Structures are given as structure tokens and as C-alpha cells.
Design a protein with these regions (language model features):
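Structured, basic alpha/beta domains of bacterial-type, RNA-associated proteins
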Residues: 2-3, 7-157, 163-185
Length: 185
């Protein structure tokens, strides 16, 4: 069995039912597919960087689940997410190992807009897209005001790190955590 991370955006009108739905999905993974749920993190309602047309809303309720399950389970969960009207968007990411601890970067509200000590440590040690796509304060350091990604020579990162940054920024934009361009602000 492989490790996966689900990022789910629920419609803000369904906020009171989010815990119930997450529990239902977790029990389905455990009972039907003999999977293992390592973490369920409810990130509360957040303002989106742009309005998602299908939901006609600029807010969403975010949740993250880390699971260990089979491909069959992933296909079933993908269809469950796709046909659930309460879910605006979802992202399924394959992880190398289980993630069991709550990520503090997801809960932080960066008011200053500058890199924290932990973010600088991430930048110096190396990173993968799976580790940084929800850390918006870190990703903003590598995006110009026009929305373009800073080239690797100017950013001072290797080509491999640049690919990881690009992938993480793409995922953050899909989840409406970062704007695609300056018109969305």
C-alpha cells in the first residue's frame, strides 16, 4: 500500500458537516479497503485568492487527510469527492512516507509577509513540492508581483529545487491559495 495526502476544499455552507464527512471517509478507507488513516487535519474556513466559479464563493473550508491505502481505494475516493456537491475541489498527492504530525505551517497566519526562521531552514536544507505546497509565505518569496515564478538563477536554487517550487506553486494555485495573476487580488 502507498501513502497519499488528500487536500479537500468544502463549500463554506457545509462547514458544520465537515467533521462528519471526514470521519465517514476515514471509516470507509479503514473498513472497505483495509487502509490506514495517519492524520486528519481540519484547517477551518479560509479566504480564497480567487473565486471558484463552480461554487460561486470566495471562501472554502480546508481539510487535509494522510492515508495509506491501495490504488482501488484512491479511485473510489476520487469518485466520491468528484460527485459530492459539498466538495468544491480536491487534490490527491502521492507521498513517499506517512505524515502523522500536524503541520504548523498550515495553521500559521503570516502577517508580515516575510520568511520565518522555519521557512529559511526549509530553503537551506532542500525541499520537495509535497512538503511546501501549503506553505504560502514560503512560496510567495519565489513569485514575482506579476505572478511569474522567479528563475532559478535569480532565486538562488538548483534546477531540481526550481522544478519542486514550480510544482508546489501550481498546486497552491489550483487550490486557490495563491493567485494566478495580479488581477485576482
Amino acid at each position: 500500500m502507498k501513502h497519499y495526502e488528500f487536500v479537500i476544499l468544502f463549500h463554506p455552507n457545509q462547514s458544520e458537516r465537515v467533521a462528519e464527512m471526514l470521519e465517514r471517509y476515514a471509516s470507509q478507507i479503514k473498513e472497505q479497503f483495509s487502509g490506514h488513516v495517519h492524520r486528519v487535519q481540519d484547517l477551518e474556513r479560509k479566504k480564497l485568492q480567487y473565486t471558484i466559479k463552480s461554487a460561486r464563493t470566495a471562501k472554502a473550508h480546508f481539510a487535509v487527510m494522510n492515508v495509506e491505502c491501495s490504488e482501488e481505494c484512491i479511485e473510489k475516493m476520487r469518485s466520491n469527492f468528484k460527485f459530492n456537491d459539498a466538495i468544491i475541489r480536491f487534490l490527491i498527492i502521492r507521498r513517499d512516507k506517512a505524515v502523522t504530525d500536524n503541520n504548523p505551517a498550515l495553521l500559521e497566519k503570516d502577517e508580515k509577509g516575510s520568511l520565518s526562521k522555519a521557512d529559511r531552514q526549509i530553503a537551506s536544507q532542500g525541499f520537495t513540492a509535497e512538503d511546501i505546497y501549503l506553505n504560502i509565505a514560503f512560496l510567495r518569496e519565489y513569485v514575482l508581483e506579476t505572478g511569474r515564478i522567479i528563475p532559478c538563477r535569480a532565486a538562488g536554487v538548483t534546477a531540481k529545487q526550481q522544478r519542486q517550487l514550480s510544482r508546489a506553486i501550481k498546486w497552491a494555485r489550483y487550490l486557490s491559495l495563491m493567485p494566478y495573476c495580479d488581477r485576482h487580488r
